[in-house]
Amino acid sequence: MPPDQMSVRFELFVQDMDQAIAFYSHILGFEVLRREEDYASLRNGTCILGLGPIAKLPEERGGYFTRSKLRSARGLGVEIVLEVDDVHAAYEHVQTCGYPIEGPLQKRNWGLTDFRLVDPDGYYLRITSRA
């Protein structure tokens, strides 16, 4: 598959749809494209995010994702990296909203500036500069 054929879309299973939508729209600036009882689609730039309720998953069997599997730490071993044009403005916005930040804004050894936070469902996010 040619590399120019890809874009990113990711889906997260969440406990509280309203809380997750509020976080991604108010804190991270995603636009709600579609909202239904069992699914929401949001966009920021070329990044598409789907949200679905954990409660609608099967308890034990019925696919890779089940409620019993998601009772442990969600997103364990996964870091969702979101690139922004102005990481300083993004950091200030999150601070102004009063949302907890996992570490201060800092320039990393690899040359990018970033900060990290955890969404209401425990998914680990890194907000980073593009260059």
Predicted features and spans:
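Vicinal oxygen chelate
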Residues: 1-9, 31-85, 89-118, 129-131
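Short, surface-exposed ligand-recognition loops at beta-strand->loop->(often short) alpha-helix junctions
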Residues: 12-16
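N-terminal first-folded block
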Residues: 18-33, 38
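Conserved active-site tyrosine of GNAT-family acetyltransferases
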Residues: 20-25, 94, 119-122
